[in-house]
């Protein structure tokens, strides 16, 4: 097929407003998601210039990064956090933006509540002043993070100047074995191509293992596209996508729904379309994963050992490994199942959806959090929290000794009151294990919700495929 296009190319082409020769094209933005951290300066810029919002009906705001997961009271916030959430509330009032504040039943992490409200739709361009905006690509949307100056530009014009990215296909063939989740799939991918293997690309995830995932699982995979350096991650929409979106608040209704689905079905990579790069993995080879170092690419299977830098031929990589081991406080050759933890965090925009909490609850039910371990569970949104409580998951966690919290970004990043102390070692379902990410001197191991819950009750990492 001469004019065969990839999924990304189709969405890109449909959104070009103008493409002057020698300049970056201008693309249209369908949805703009806003939170309290990266928006204040953008709104201030509009006020100084006397500009209005170009499309307030396509702008959605929430409070998530700085909010307390212990109390919905403003008094629970630090002075800086309180200033940020109050500033967002005032800006939304001044500019007519829909806001899901800390008292709204649908408030939550921006990348959790957006999809569950039907704001995220196939074939759209979605931006947010947040690096994990790629999450929304699970629906066949082109979604990526932007900086504060770009936030202001989108608020004012509903457009962005963007250079077209290269295309990469990551195909995960076959089916995973028991105990292997979407988190393990994406960690295995990053382990294979590295934390910069996707730089300059928009990645399309495909293959039987991806198609078999729920929308929650696909969101987990696309969420971490940025952790392999990619601009965005995408999965072609299919019946799983349509079933998830049907009836959601901002999804099309009636005849509009029928027309939308017909259009969405065409948003897929054509036979014969050529990618700039192709990566293949066999799902059957993927075991439960966990990181050992200080970036998501420093990852091994649970039945493996901490790698030895001496076996690395590349001097730069070897030095990076040595530095990571020094910070993380591990010795080469240590079995991963011998690593003890004292903190567990189940939450974040990567793994705080209902499927994630159900998976974790399986390993918490009838057990107790190990002595000396503090474990918290933070639902990704008010909707997730309500559903989990309706299913009795909160009781399972509480009876096992986990703390059950309010929605928010929480311990993913040391920007609120949920943070690690120096020397703490945490099994975390978040997306980044950089030095100090969860608190100064903190040591983070990225895992799936099931692996995190199992570590909480065992006091160390375990292979959830085996009795423990």
From Swiss-Prot:
Cofactor(s) recorded for this entry are: [4Fe-4S] cluster
Q: Name one GO biological process term.
A: L-leucine biosynthetic process
* Chain positions recorded as [4Fe-4S] cluster binding sites: 349, 409, 412
Q: What class of enzyme is it?
A: lyase
The cofactor note reads: Binds 1 [4Fe-4S] cluster per subunit.
> InterPro entries annotated for this entry?
3-IsopropMal_deHydase_lsu (IPR004430), Acnase/IPM_dHydase_lsu_aba_1/3 (IPR015931), Acoase/IPM_deHydtase_lsu_aba (IPR001030), Aconitase_4Fe-4S_BS (IPR018136), Aconitase_4Fe-4S_dom (IPR036008), IPM_dehydratase_rel_enz (IPR050067), IPMI_cat (IPR033941)
Q: Which UniProt keywords apply?
A: 4Fe-4S, Amino-acid biosynthesis, Branched-chain amino acid biosynthesis, Iron, Iron-sulfur, Leucine biosynthesis, Lyase, Metal-binding
Annotated pathway, please? Amino-acid biosynthesis; L-leucine biosynthesis; L-leucine from 3-methyl-2-oxobutanoate: step 2/4
Q: Which reaction does it catalyse?
A: (2R,3S)-3-isopropylmalate = (2S)-2-isopropylmalate
Segments passing through the bilayer: none
Q: What is its EC number?
A: 4.2.1.33
Tell me the GO molecular function terms.
Answer: 3-isopropylmalate dehydratase activity; 4 iron, 4 sulfur cluster binding; metal ion binding
* NCBIfam families (UniProt xref): leuC (TIGR00170), PRK05478.1 (NF004016), PRK12466.1 (NF009116)
**How does the record describe its quaternary structure?**
Heterodimer of LeuC and LeuD.
Q: Which family does it belong to?
A: Belongs to the aconitase/IPM isomerase family. LeuC type 1 subfamily.
This chain's function reads:
Catalyzes the isomerization between 2-isopropylmalate and 3-isopropylmalate, via the formation of 2-isopropylmaleate.
Q: What is this protein called?
A: 3-isopropylmalate dehydratase large subunit
Which organism does this record belong to? Shewanella baltica (strain OS223)
